[in-house]
From Swiss-Prot:
PANTHER family in the cross-refs: WRKY TRANSCRIPTION FACTOR 21-RELATED (PTHR31282)
SUPFAM superfamilies: WRKY DNA-binding domain (SSF118290)
Protein name as it appears in the record: Probable WRKY transcription factor 7
Residue ranges, annotated region (Disordered): 117-259
Single GO MF annotation: transcription cis-regulatory region binding
Organism classification: Eukaryota, Viridiplantae, Streptophyta, Embryophyta, Tracheophyta
Free-text function comment from the UniProt entry: Transcription factor. Interacts specifically with the W box (5'-(T)TGAC[CT]-3'), a frequently occurring elicitor-responsive cis-acting element.
Segments of the chain annotated as binding DNA: 275-341
Origin superkingdom: Eukaryota
Regulation: induction: By salicylic acid and strongly during leaf senescence.
């Protein structure tokens, strides 16, 4: 069945006609050879499958037979492929139609731009731009080609070398700056700055003076009091800008900081009762202002402040001991300054009178 389908598809396209007996005979011979080769190939495949199914334990004899049958089947199919690949001979030939001169769509213009940039001296630096455009010749195009404006590199700002030399020698510029309406000079000069490296930061190279401010970024402000006076604010002093510790900029500032010196004194006293509100009394009066739970203890910690004299900074906190619930740990913080508070109160009272 497979061979008949192959042969019908092969012979249907270009078989012989009644007017050409020689061509028809040649085509018939090719069909016969193709049919025989295809039948031999299919028969070889059937034999190959049969041998593989029979030989459960392959031996040398069975291997030889399988190899021979495989070679026959492969050669038969190669012959079929070669017969099918031959150029067909006969009256059925194809002719190429003449190429159509009209294109079904318009071609968009192709734009090729070649830009060459040459850097020369700062005084004569320029950009050379070359553009090559190929447009479609048939009719005008509805699309406009966008050509960007060439970018010209401008030379750096030129400076007066004589003024720079006079500034280095005399310490001040010889040229008088322009005057404002109030008569105070105020100029801003832009100068090229050296490249800033990773070790030389902007903050480390900043220098602030009362008369002028110079920064490594190339800006020079003359008489900053006039600039800051426009906003109604006084100029910043140099002392306010030098409060930062400059000993080690990479690490933390290790300058001495003032902290509240609190003297703590811890004592253990027996509890008066099992209630937390009952604390042993001493020579001062105390008022509770809060409590805080303690991790690992069922009893909270109470915080008290001295209420003997108003404004006394003395504090204490009371908590029960972990080893003995009938013992209290009292921690005192701060000193009593009742005399100082009384003197201040008396002075204020006298002033009011």
């Amino acid at each position: 069945m497979t061979v008949e389908l192959m042969m019908s598809s092969y012979s249907g396209g270009g078989g012989g006609g009644d007017g050409f007996p020689a061509i028809a005979a040649a085509a018939k011979m090719e069909d016969t050879a193709l049919r025989e080769a295809a039948s031999a190939g299919i028969h070889g495949v059937e034999e190959f499958l049969k041998l593989i199914g029979q030989s459960q334990q392959p031996t040398e004899k069975s291997q030889t037979e399988i190899t021979a049958v495989t070679d026959v089947a492969v050669n038969s199919f190669k012959k079929v492929i070669s017969l099918l690949g031959r150029s067909r001979t006969g009256h059925a030939r194809f002719r190429r139609a003449p190429a159509s001169t009209q294109t079904p769509f318009k071609q968009t213009p192709v734009v090729e731009e070649e830009v060459e940039v040459e850097e020369k001296k700062p005084e004569t630096s320029s950009v050379l731009t070359k553009q090559k455009t190929e447009q479609y010749h048939g009719g005008g195009s509805a699309f406009r080609v966008y050509c960007p404006t060439p970018i010209h590199r401008r030379p750096p700002l030129s400076h007066n070398n004589n003024n720079n030399q006079n500034q280095t020698k005399n310490g001040s510029s010889s040229s008088s700056p322009p005057m404002l309406a109030n008569g105070a000079p105020s100029t801003i000069n832009f100068a090229p700055s050296p490249p800033v490296s990773a070790t030389n930061s902007f903050m480390s190279s900043h220098r602030c003076d009362t008369d002028s401010t110079h920064m490594s970024s190339g800006f020079e402000f003359t008489n900053p009091s006039q600039l800051s006076g426009s906003r109604g604010k006084p100029p910043l002093s140099s002392a306010s800008l030098k409060r930062r510790c400059n000993s080690s900029p990479s690490s933390r500032c290790h300058c001495s900081k003032k902290r509240k010196s609190r003297v703590k004194r811890v004592i253990r006293v027996p509890a008066v009762s099992s209630k937390m509100a009952d604390i042993p009394s001493d020579e001062f009066s105390w008022r509770k202002y809060g409590q805080k739970p303690i991790k690992g203890s069922p009893h909270p910690r109470g915080y008290y402040k001295c209420s003997s004299v108003r404004g006394c900074p003395a504090r204490k906190h009371v908590e029960r001991a972990l080893d003995d619930a009938m013992m209290l740990i009292v921690t005192y913080e701060g000193d009593h300054n009742h005399a100082l508070v009384l003197e201040t109160t008396t002075m204020n009272h006298d002033k009011t009178l």
